[in-house]
Amino acid sequence: MTAERRPLIAGNWKMNGLRAAKSELRTVAAGLAGLSAETMICPPFTLIGAFAADVAGTQLMIGGQDCHPAESGAHTGDISAEMLRDAGAVAVILGHSERRIDHQEGDAIVKAKVKAAWRAGLLPVVCVGETLVERDAGEAAAVVTRQVRQSVPEGATAVSLVIAYEPIWAIGTGRTPTTDDVAEVHGAIRHILAERFGAEANGIRILYGGSVKPDNAAALLATANVDGALVGGASLKAADFLAIARAVG
């Protein structure tokens, strides 16, 4: 982390949470005073409006978990970036491995969704990451570099893009790469961002995600070119999420 990149701790609730979960959200919002990091919770779409209203005036931001590339139209079951913004979201996670795998979303569709997020005034958090087979073959940096190259449109700036590195084999498994492994991949991401966007790359935040917990957060967040975390399961519990946010140096 550097002075020009304010840390971001974002919680991805995935397909979890009912309206009763507002109690956890309120606990998080109440516990953020004095923290140096920006914080965000990305709940299911059904909760965005209620959550955004509940935390209005606090430091906690609300984001979405996906959006359709189109602004509107005959896309049953989909949500547009404009709908997310209208509901109170300020950002959206795009290209998560669970979307890439479960819905066969490739880099081209992720790129289109990033453009949609920009169109609606949302901050896209673009996820990239390798499989265990790719990691064991020594291809992690190459895979992630390719994903950044193909998933992120031209014109990205320090205030319009966040990248989240989530090694697929570490998501929800309790396994994490070493801090050296994380530093290597984050360094590769920083390099391709600099190659594409010049000086703007110095301000683009790169988050780490994949089994981030209170007991490993400090080490991960102290790693070179790690500017925050995209937190999965641990973000569902206010105490755990706050502990991770407090681990920012």
Swiss-Prot record:
Its main location: cytoplasm. GO terms for cellular component: cytosol. It holds the Pfam family TIM. This is Triosephosphate isomerase. The keyword Amino-acid biosynthesis does not apply. Keywords: Cytoplasm, Gluconeogenesis, Glycolysis, Isomerase. Involved in the gluconeogenesis. Catalyzes stereospecifically the conversion of dihydroxyacetone phosphate (DHAP) to D-glyceraldehyde-3-phosphate (G3P). The active site is at H96 (electrophile), E166 (proton acceptor). GO terms for biological process: gluconeogenesis; glyceraldehyde-3-phosphate biosynthetic process; glycerol catabolic process; glycolytic process. It is found in: Cytoplasm. Belongs to the triosephosphate isomerase family. It catalyses: D-glyceraldehyde 3-phosphate = dihydroxyacetone phosphate. SUPFAM superfamilies: Triosephosphate isomerase (TIM). Substrate binds at N12, W13, K14, G172, S211, G232, G233.
